[in-house]
């Protein structure tokens, strides 16, 4: 059964990619940032993530935000395990910084996925400040142990608990997964907890509404450690999604930021496994990110000229034609069939 599920999932993703290539004027672009120590070896472990994004229907490209501008056709930017910081806000006279480009991209209804290695996260000052404004604060000095929900003996390979609150954004993203009688496991290895920076999980920014929701969290009995010392117990956030709602011409538009504090979430051992749902969740998120967008700009024409451009005589001639010709064809066909049968 597991094998069938994996094959079906793969076929679905390939089919979606093929449909998008045929129907879209241009395939939407998904960028992977480079220039911050990210793993760019597409023949190595990151290949699974690149392939998954491509099979979701994206044109996958690298981008160095310090040198390149974001293509208007881009829908998604992925920051995967950076070790060095992004350029922060600068004087306008020298152009847009990397953070400012990310900000403008999200303002333009793009979406962002952030996978942070907590061992290097504390050095990402500018990126952390940017994510703070989206309700996300990583507690890099802590590691989560959830012995009650772990696939490893040490308790640090945490099985994330799905958000079952039907009123929250995260639940709607992967509702098809949580509707199963038994949900597949999603793994967070050596993860740090995420704090919400919004009071009541909402904030208004420049008249736009933002809301943050836990995509996954631990059990209520999870523990957090600092340098092998137990410093807290309770339920902790493993992955969050923030949605910004913008009203344009009385229509709602959305941008998203997905974040998790573990370098292992996108590891090939989890993305390629038939056992775990890490890839299924990311795929569900990407579909949610893109559903407010129209994949192809197909022009349509409204026909509002209802006047007849023929005379009455012409109309009568066409009427006689459609009354006589079909009847004549039927008679001739009947005669032909009768003769054939008689002399057969």
Predicted stretch roles:
Residues 1-344:
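Short, surface-exposed patches at the edges or C-terminal ends of soluble domains, predominantly
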């Amino acid at each position: 059964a597991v094998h069938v599920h994996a094959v079906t999932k793969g076929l679905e993703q390939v089919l979606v990619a093929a449909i998008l290539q045929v129907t879209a004027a241009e395939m939407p672009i998904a960028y992977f940032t480079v220039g911050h120590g990210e793993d760019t070896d597409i023949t190595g472990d990151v290949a699974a993530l690149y392939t998954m994004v491509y099979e979701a229907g994206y044109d996958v490209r690298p981008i160095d935000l310090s040198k390149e501008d974001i293509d208007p056709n881009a829908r998604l930017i992925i920051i995967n395990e950076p070790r060095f910081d992004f350029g922060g806000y600068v004087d306008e006279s020298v152009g847009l910084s990397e953070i400012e480009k990310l900000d403008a991209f999200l303002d333009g209804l793009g979406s962002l996925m952030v996978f942070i290695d907590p061992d290097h996260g504390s050095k990402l000052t500018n990126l952390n400040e940017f994510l703070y404004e989206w309700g996300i604060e990583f507690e890099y000095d802590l590691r989560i142990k959830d012995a009650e929900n772990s696939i490893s003996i040490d308790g640090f390979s945490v099985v994330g608990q799905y958000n079952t609150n039907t009123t929250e954004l995260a639940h709607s993203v992967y509702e098809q997964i949580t509707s199963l009688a038994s949900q597949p496991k999603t793994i967070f290895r050596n993860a740090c907890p995420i704090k919400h920076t919004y009071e009541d999980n909402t904030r208004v920014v420049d008249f736009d509404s933002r809301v943050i929701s836990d995509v996954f969290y631990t059990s209520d009995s999870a523990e957090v450690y600092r340098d092998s010392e137990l410093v807290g117990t309770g339920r902790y956030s493993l992955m969050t999604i923030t949605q910004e709602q913008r009203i344009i011409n009385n229509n709602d538009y959305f941008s998203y930021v997905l974040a998790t504090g573990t370098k292992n979430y996108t590891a090939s051992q989890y993305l390629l496994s038939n056992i775990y749902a890490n890839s299924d969740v990311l795929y569900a998120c990407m579909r949610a990110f893109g559903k407010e967008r129209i994949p192809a700009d197909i022009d349509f024409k409204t026909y509002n000229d209802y006047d007849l451009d023929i005379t009455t005589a012409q109309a009568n001639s066409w009427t006689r034609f459609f009354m006589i010709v079909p009847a004549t064809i039927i008679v001739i066909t009947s005669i032909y069939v009768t003769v054939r049968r008689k002399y057969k």
